[in-house]
Structures are given as C-alpha cells and as structure tokens.
C-alpha cells in the first residue's frame, strides 16, 4: 500500500514539474528568435564596400590585401579573409572587384571583410533577376526585376545581401514585431542545382564576424548559369 502511495506522489510531482517547465521552454524559444532577429538586423543594416578594378597588393594562404586608395585616399586597403582554396585563385597585381560587408569598424588604414572578391569586370551589364516568394507555403507575388546585379560574375555574398536588403525594406523580416521565425533563399541554376542560404542563422555570439564568416568560401556564380531565386518565409 505504501509503495502505491509513493508511486502516486512521484507521478504528481512529475506532472507539476512538466507543467512548470513547459512555459519556460516556450518562453526561451521566443527569446531565442528575438535575439536572432536583433543580431541579424544589426549585422545587415550596413553599407557594403563596393569597389571596382582594385589591385591586389599581396596575398597569403588565407588573405588578400587590396589597394583601395583611389576610393578612400591615403594608404588604404581592404583585407579579405577567405578559405585557402578561394585565395589561391588570386595573386599579387591581379585586378579585382570588391563587394563585401565589414566586420571590423573604424580601422584607421584598412577595412576587413570575408570573401567578397571577383575578377575585375569592365563591361557594363544589368542582370534583372527572376524571383518568387512563398510565405508559409503559399505563393505570393513574384519578385521579378526587384534585384539587379551589375556584373557577370558575382559572389553569393552580394546576391545574399541584396535579397536580404529587399526583404528587410519591404517585409521587415528582422523587426521585433515581424511574424517570421525562419526562412531561406534558394538560388537555382540552369543545370537544375540549388544553393540554399539560411535567412535566420546567427551563430555563436551573433556578432558581425560570427554572421559574416560564412562568406570566407568566396563562392561565386556566373550569371550566364543563373536561373532564378526562391524565398521561403515561415511564420
């Protein structure tokens, strides 16, 4: 009889603990997405460095040092950190284009980015992208011609930033009152492949360095192979 009573007491305590802990877990979950949005809103509220036809001063196994004096005056440079595989595609005295998001602010002589480097391109082009938007699985208006790229070879960093900027301006995806809790961009190419970009990824401490480090791979795409992009947002 005593054994049965003990079992009942243990059961009651367990139920009470579960009912007490559950709201806490739910609350923490909401806090997490709130922090993620705050991190991303701060990180991507930024003016990118957009420089054309700059000379590579020197390269290391993981860094390109790029002369930007003609844009900034004085002895100024861009330091782009990237993977070994990406850095080996460039060498001293190459001319490159830069589109990058800084992760160190107020440096006196240099600007620090991850990736964001393509061979210099002098031809003037206007690639108006075809795009679709889905919210909670339902197709919305198409986003054709909303995103424009002015180079034949671009980094995923540039595509990512310009699409995010459009979503931040028009759908307020990172605002505190935004209903969106997850989302992704899918980049489709003409060979049927798709590359995904997580719109709600804020790793580690959520600093600009943490968030932008994914661009170290300096992934690029030739716009001749670009098909379209799809955006999926979830409430």
From Swiss-Prot:
Query: One Pfam family this chain carries?
Result: Stap_Strp_tox_C
**What are the boundaries of the signal sequence?**
1-27
Q: Which keywords does this Swiss-Prot/TrEMBL entry list?
A: Metal-binding, Signal, Toxin, Virulence, Zinc
Q: Name one GO molecular function term.
A: metal ion binding
PROSITE patterns xrefs: STAPH_STREP_TOXIN_1 (PS00277), STAPH_STREP_TOXIN_2 (PS00278)
Detail which positions bind Zn(2+). 194, 228, 230
Q: What's an example GO cellular component term for this entry?
A: extracellular region
Please name the InterPro entries in this protein's record.
Answer: Enterotoxin, Staph/Strept_toxin_CS, Staph_tox_OB, SuperAg_toxin_C, Superantigen_bac, Toxin_b-grasp_Staph/Strep, Toxin_bac
Family assignment? Belongs to the staphylococcal/streptococcal toxin family.
Function description = Superantigen that acts as a causative agent of the symptoms associated with scarlet fever. Has been associated with streptococcal toxic shock-like disease and may play a role in the early events of rheumatic fever. Superantigens cross-link major histocompatibility complex (MHC) class II and T-cell receptor (TCR) molecules, resulting in an overstimulation of T-cells associated with a massive release of pyrogenic and inflammatory cytokines.
Q: What is this protein called?
A: Exotoxin type C
Task: List the source organism.
Answer: Streptococcus pyogenes serotype M1
Organism lineage reads as:
Bacteria, Bacillati, Bacillota, Bacilli, Lactobacillales
Supply the gene name: speC
